[in-house]
Amino acid sequence: SILDAHLYEQKIVDDESALATAESFIALNVYPERRALSGEKTLKVLMKYGLRFGEMSCFHRYNEDGTKLLFSVLQITDTGMDGFDLENLSTDPIKGLAFFLALPHRDVQNAFDTMDSISRLIAREIDGTVYDQNNQEFTPQLREHWRHLAIDYRAGQAIDA
């Protein structure tokens, strides 16, 4: 029904709005090894792994049935992180991708594991490397460290690396 469709869309909007009210974030950064990515390649790879453009000019990844926001992606620029401009994306060079998980999160383990997996798949596809939010190469040890921080996160807590 029309009402069901509206409520479904509103649920997605509410989930995305969680980004604006998040207390903390865990981020993974993916940088190509040699040179900036073309905007066209960036768009293709994000879409290939199920990310959709949406609120705050980010790409968002949802759970399997599309009802729960798992994580989002911004582009990395010379001045930091920024949203994507779809009008100019095909011609913009992209220096890197910032994957981020808003905390607290109702399905944090699945969200973190999906973000970790997709960031590594994309890094492999663009001949890049995954780094943590402190720009340390994302080793298996760091992966476990950040995964436990995400899972153990409690409202009001600071994320300390």
Give residue ranges: language-model regions.
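Active-site-adjacent structural patch at catalytic or cofactor/ligand-binding sites
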Residues: 71-78, 84, 91-105
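Short, intrinsically disordered, mixed-charge
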Residues: 44-52, 78, 117-128
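Short flexible coil/turn linkers enriched for glycine and charged/polar residues
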Residues: 22, 65, 91-94
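Well-ordered alpha/beta subsegment
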Residues: 98-161
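Extracytoplasmic beta-rich ectodomain segments of secreted or membrane-anchored proteins
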Residues: 19-61
